[in-house]
Amino acid sequence: NANRTQIDSFIESINSNYSVFDALKRVKISNDVKEFTHFTFEIIESGKIHCIAAAFTYGREDIIPEMFIEIINELEPANVHCNRLKYYLERHVEIDGDLHGPIAREMVKELCGTDKKKWEEVLNVGRECILKRIQLWDAIHDIIV
């Protein structure tokens, strides 16, 4: 039974027509979690489809399979019995790695074409997404350990 107070407060703020950015200011959560969410919605609000696709591709579809493989590899020798979690992780690795990742990369390629400025923006967004994801996971680690 996780404490959902801040999540419920955030959702309530959104439902009360606060912007995501203002709703984030109202909740008491880790600054790293706020930064990750804020950054994500800044990209969305930019309206630049190639940047949104880059965030999705390089901040999620391309890196999550590797992260989940590491978790699976650490669960097995530790003899941790989490069959549902393991199934969830393995399924994500299979779908994201074999299907979603390649399709997402193709989508970015299609959206950028030969436009050097778009490719530069995609590179910057991808790099920043990975850094924000690392900060998020470090914050989660600090909270639960």
Label each PLM-derived region with a short phrase.
Residues N1-V145:
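Non-heme di-metal
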